[in-house]
């Protein structure tokens, strides 16, 4: 097996909160995932295995490195005060293919399966990285709270007297929108892209690991992002990027 082109991969994403204890703006350190798409055949390692990168059947029981998760908690404790309104949590991420947001029944199912968050990214990259022996640190920003309550019933007598406008407002409560995801990302930009990222990266770099930091949050306020007017990506080395495709 060839040595990996990097030792550590840090990824971030925006996710819907399934855990009722989570709030919009909370940051969650991933410790496990549910790859729902992978269970039905949508898997990044399908096809002939590239033996130079890893084994045919890699184990994912320890996909999220414990040491890196500990460093993330230590860095957060060092940078936040008791008065901070943003919490750092640790939980399980459910990956779905999208692009639609989840139905209420799907949200209840995912939460019942043990997921704390749900999103449409990150897990394929993590699987490819772990296949190549790369350590993973993954962080989610909770950008909206998933709706777990059952949908309104057509025979609900309490709804019969509602005006169409009131009915629309009632049914729209908690509905996920892309705009609220963008807004939550912009609000968290300073914490996530400057303070937290810098401290965690410095903590990891102290171990002299080579680090790839993949930034997926929108609305970053640091100068480099404003100049590029785009997401920030530190490029994967060529052969790793080709394997990821």
PLM regions: where:
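Catalytic-face loop-and-helix region of soluble metabolic enzyme cores
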Residues: 145-179
